[in-house]
Each structure stands twice: as structure tokens, then as C-alpha cells.
Amino acid sequence: MDSIDEQIAIKRKELQSLQKITSLTDGLKIQLTELNEQIKEMGMNADSVAQLMNNWDSIINNISQASLGLLQYAEGDYEIGPWKDSKKKESEQSNETGLEAQENDKNDEDNDEDEDLVPLPETMVRIRVDGNE
């Protein structure tokens, strides 16, 4: 009977060890599942960050292109006063008469209206760059 009692005690220890292993395995399974969910969330966040960085690259490129459009203008183009003064000097120097003078006056009036406007940068247009649509 001693051998049977010893075998029962050994089997009970094995059962307790297996139950501990099972509970530890279940805990490990839960932790791995949580880790998997966190990794998926990090992947989605990384995609969001990548998309955000692409958007900023697009914004910077658009700003760069708009600023390149301004390079064609000199600093004096933004000063309205010298334009008016130069037109007055030109009109004082011209001593044309007859129809030519009247035509020049009409052209000068049209030019004065155009020259009173300060040059503006190129219009920026929003263009969707992702391939979804």
C-alpha cells in the first residue's frame, strides 16, 4: 500500500505542477494577445504618422512652388509710389499732339489702373495626392 500511496502523492504533485503550468500558459496567452493588439495599434499609428509626414511634404512643396512664383518680381514691384511717379514723368516728357496723344492718354489710364495693383503670388490649388480616388 505504501507504493500506491507514494504513486498517488507523486501523481498529485504532477497534477499540481500541470495546473500551475496551465495557469501560467493561460496568463502568457492573455499577455501575448494584449501585446498583439498593442502592436497592431502601433502599426496603425505608424501609418497615420507616415500619412501626416507625406501631407507635410506636400505642403512644403506647395509653399516652395508658390515662393518660386514670387521670384519673378523685384522688390520695387511692391512699391506703388514709384510706379505713379514714373508715369507722371513719362507723361510730362512726352509732347505728342493730335490722335497719338489721345491714344496714349487712353493707354496711360489703362496702364495706371493695372499698375496700381500690387503683384500677387500665383494662386495655390489643392490637389488630392493619395490614390484613394
Swiss-Prot record:
PANTHER family: DASH COMPLEX SUBUNIT DAD2. Component of the DASH complex that connects microtubules with kinetochores and couples microtubule depolymerisation to chromosome movement; it is involved in retrieving kinetochores to the spindle poles before their re-orientation on the spindle in early mitosis and allows microtubule depolymerization to pull chromosomes apart and resist detachment during anaphase. InterPro entries: DASH_Dad2 (IPR013963). The modification N-acetylmethionine is found at M1. This is DASH complex subunit DAD2. GO terms for biological process: attachment of spindle microtubules to kinetochore; cell division; mitotic sister chromatid biorientation; positive regulation of attachment of spindle microtubules to kinetochore; positive regulation of microtubule polymerization; protein transport along microtubule to mitotic spindle pole body. Present with 279 molecules/cell in log phase SD medium. Component of the DASH complex consisting of ASK1, DAD1, DAD2, DAD3, DAD4, DAM1, DUO1, HSK3, SPC19 and SPC34, with a stoichiometry of one copy of each subunit per complex. Multiple DASH complexes oligomerize to form a ring that encircles spindle microtubules and organizes the rod-like NDC80 complexes of the outer kinetochore. DASH complex oligomerization strengthens microtubule attachments. On cytoplasmic microtubules, DASH complexes appear to form patches instead of rings. Residues 1-51 form a coiled coil. Keywords: Acetylation, Cell cycle, Cell division, Centromere, Chromosome, Chromosome partition, Coiled coil, Cytoplasm, Cytoskeleton, Kinetochore, Microtubule, Mitosis, Nucleus. It comes from Saccharomyces cerevisiae (strain ATCC 204508 / S288c) (Baker's yeast). Its main location: nucleus. It holds the Pfam family DASH_Dad2. Residues 82-92 have a biased composition (Basic and acidic residues). GO terms for cellular component: cytoplasm; DASH complex; microtubule; mitotic spindle; mitotic spindle midzone; mitotic spindle pole body. It comes from the Eukaryota. Belongs to the DASH complex DAD2 family. Residues 106-117 have a biased composition (Acidic residues). It is found in: Nucleus; Cytoplasm, Cytoskeleton, Spindle; Chromosome, Centromere, Kinetochore; Chromosome. Residues 81-133 are annotated as: Disordered.
